[in-house]
Swiss-Prot record:
It comes from Mannheimia succiniciproducens (strain KCTC 0769BP / MBEL55E). It catalyses: tRNA(Phe) + L-phenylalanine + ATP = L-phenylalanyl-tRNA(Phe) + AMP + diphosphate + H(+). GO terms for cellular component: cytoplasm. Its cofactor is Mg(2+). Belongs to the class-II aminoacyl-tRNA synthetase family. Phe-tRNA synthetase alpha subunit type 1 subfamily. Mg(2+) binds at residue 254. Tetramer of two alpha and two beta subunits. Pfam families: Phe_tRNA-synt_N, tRNA-synt_2d. Its EC number is 6.1.1.20. This is Phenylalanine--tRNA ligase alpha subunit. Binds 2 magnesium ions per tetramer. The gene is pheS.
C-alpha cells in the first residue's frame, strides 16, 4: 500500500497549494484524483489484483484515505464558494441611504388646463358639454348658421374642403345646430373642440381649439350675456379686470359684440366674440324666435391660454418642448 500513502500525501500537498487558486483549480484537482481515470479510482480498480482474503481490509484503507482527501476538498470548495459569494455581495452592495430614482410626473398640457378651467366654471352655471364631428357638412358649418353660399363671411374662414359639401369644421358652432335640432329650449350647453383653418403664423395654427356657449330660453337678453361673461373673465384671469363689449358682426348673432379686456400694458386685448342668436338660426332648427331667445359666445382656447400665461408664440403649444411644458405643472 506504499502507492496509497504516496498518492494521499501528494493529494494533500496539492490541496495545500490550491488555497488561493479558486473553484476552477479545485475542479481540476477533483478530476485528477477522483475522475474516471483519477488516482483513487485506479487504486479501487487495482483491488481485483489483491488476494480475496486481503481485499476488504485494503479496500477499507483506500476508502478511508479517499474520504479524508474528499473532506479536505469539500471544505476548501465550501470556503471558496463562500468567499466568492461575499466578494459578489460586496461588489453589488446597495447603499440604502442613497436617494431613490426620481419619478418624473407628467402634467396637463396648458391648453387642456384652460379647457378644464373654462368648462368647470360654466358647468357650475348649469351648462353641459356637447360634442360633434370634426368632419362637418357645409350645411352645419355655414348654411344653418346664416352663412349661405357666396356670403362674404365664408372667405374669412380659410376652410379645408374635402369636396363642395364636406369640410374640416372651422368652428364648433355646428354642434349648437345639431343640439337645437334634437332638444327644445331651455338649452344651456358648451362645446369644446378642435377646429381647422388654413393659416399658420405666430398667432394662427391650422388646428386650434374653441369653446362655444349657447343659452336659449324665454326672455334671454343681452344683459344676461354680459353678466355671465363679466363673471367668467374675472374668474378665469383671477383679476378684477376692466371688460368692454365692442359692437361687431357675426352672421349667426344679432346684435353681436367682441369682448376685450384691459392688458397690463394699458391696451385693450380681444378675448372672445358673442351675441344674441340670430332669428334666422332659430328658425332653421324649428324654434320660434318670437317665443324664445338666446345668446352665444365663442372663445379661442389658445388665445385665452396665451393671455393667462403670458405666452407670445401660439406655436409653442404644439412643439412638445418639455422645457416649455414643464412650466405648467
Amino acid at each position: 500500500m506504499q502507492n496509497l500513502k504516496e498518492i494521499t500525501e501528494q493529494a494533500r500537498a496539492a490541496l495545500d497549494e490550491l488555497h488561493d487558486k479558486g473553484l476552477d483549480a479545485l475542479e481540476a484537482f477533483r478530476v485528477e484524483y477522483f475522475g474516471k481515470k483519477g488516482h483513487f479510482t485506479q487504486l479501487m480498480q487495482s483491488l481485483r489484483n489483491v488476494a480475496a482474503e486481503e481485499r476488504p481490509a485494503v479496500g477499507a484503507k483506500i476508502n478511508e484515505a479517499k474520504q479524508a482527501v474528499l473532506d479536505i476538498l469539500n471544505a476548501k470548495k465550501e470556503a471558496f464558494e463562500k468567499a466568492a459569494l461575499n466578494a459578489q455581495l460586496e461588489k453589488e452592495r446597495i447603499d440604502v441611504s442613497l436617494p431613490g430614482r426620481k419619478v418624473e410626473l407628467g402634467g396637463l398640457h396648458p391648453v387642456s388646463l384652460t379647457i378644464e378651467r373654462v368648462t368647470k366654471f360654466f358647468s357650475e352655471l348649469g351648462f353641459s358639454v356637447e360634442s360633434g364631428p370634426e368632419i362637418e357638412s357645409d350645411y352645419y358649418n355655414f348654411d344653418a348658421l346664416n352663412i349661405p353660399k357666396h356670403h362674404p363671411a365664408r372667405a374669412d374662414h380659410d376652410t379645408f374642403w374635402f369636396n363642395p359639401e364636406l369640410l374640416l369644421r372651422t368652428q364648433t358652432s355646428g354642434v349648437q345646430i345639431r343640439t337645437m335640432e334634437k332638444k327644445q329650449p331651455p338649452i344651456r350647453i358648451m362645446v369644446p373642440g378642435k377646429v381647422y383653418r388654413n393659416d399658420y403664423d405666430q398667432t394662427h395654427t391650422p388646428m386650434f381649439h374653441q369653446i362655444e356657449l349657447l343659452y336659449e330660453d324665454k326672455k334671454v337678453n343681452f344683459t344676461e350675456l354680459k353678466g355671465v361673461l363679466y363673471d367668467f373673465l374675472r374668474a378665469f384671469f383671477e383679476e378684477d379686470l376692466q371688460v368692454r363689449f365692442r359692437p361687431s358682426y357675426f352672421p349667426f348673432t344679432e346684435p353681436s359684440a367682441e369682448v376685450d379686456i384691459m392688458g397690463k400694458n394699458g391696451k385693450w386685448l380681444e378675448v372672445l366674440g358673442c351675441g344674441m342668436v340670430h332669428p334666422n338660426v332659430l328658425r332653421s332648427v324649428g324654434i320660434d324666435p318670437n317665443e324664445y331667445s338666446g345668446f352665444a359666445a365663442g372663445m379661442g382656447v389658445e388665445r385665452l391660454t396665451m393671455l393667462r400665461y403670458n405666452v407670445t408664440d401660439l406655436r409653442s403649444f404644439f412643439e412638445n418642448d418639455l422645457r416649455f411644458l414643464k412650466q405648467f405643472k
